[in-house]
């Protein structure tokens, strides 16, 4: 995927992002647009559909471009959830310190801490 500098993000945020991205392991890779859900990036004519504004394009997991409003791409619910979490993490990471990024990170579930059990 895209190389992102996570040094400005708080450590807990970095862990949440990395955990969200790791859930995409094994999914197909392709060139992704990076922002297909923005209606301003779609141009439709009677016989064609096109995406414009490819400045965020990169090679990554295909599911990232399939997180569309109302699950328009028809992903199964588990795949949609995984992709939505990873997408929110990516958006938070690429523009950290921006209010939008902070809101997107809030959508990424916290990493579950392992419980320690046993007897002494």
Residue spans for each PLM region:
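An alpha-helical support segment within catalytic cores of ATP-dependent transferases
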Residues: 1-35, 45, 115-119
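N-terminal alpha-helical segment
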Residues: 2, 16, 62, 85-88
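A generic fold-level signal
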Residues: 24-26, 37, 61, 84
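Active-site Asp-x-Gly
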Residues: 31, 43-84
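Conserved short aromatic-hydrophobic micro-motifs
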Residues: 36-37, 92
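Anionic-ligand binding region
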Residues: 40
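Helix-rich C-terminal or lid/interface subdomains of diverse kinases
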Residues: 67, 74-120
């Amino acid at each position: 995927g895209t190389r992102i500098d996570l040094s400005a993000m708080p450590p807990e945020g970095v862990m949440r992002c990395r955990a969200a991205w790791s859930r995409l392991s094994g999914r197909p890779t392709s060139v992704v647009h990076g922002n297909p859900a923005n209606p301003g990036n779609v141009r439709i004519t009677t016989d064609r559909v096109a995406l414009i504004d490819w400045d965020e394009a990169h090679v990554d997991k295909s599911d990232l471009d399939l997180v569309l409003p109302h699950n328009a791409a028809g992903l199964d619910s588990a795949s949609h959830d995984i992709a939505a979490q990873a997408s929110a993490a990516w958006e938070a990471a690429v523009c950290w310190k921006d209010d939008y990024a902070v809101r997107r990170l809030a959508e990424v579930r916290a990493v579950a801490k392992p419980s320690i059990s046993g007897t002494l």
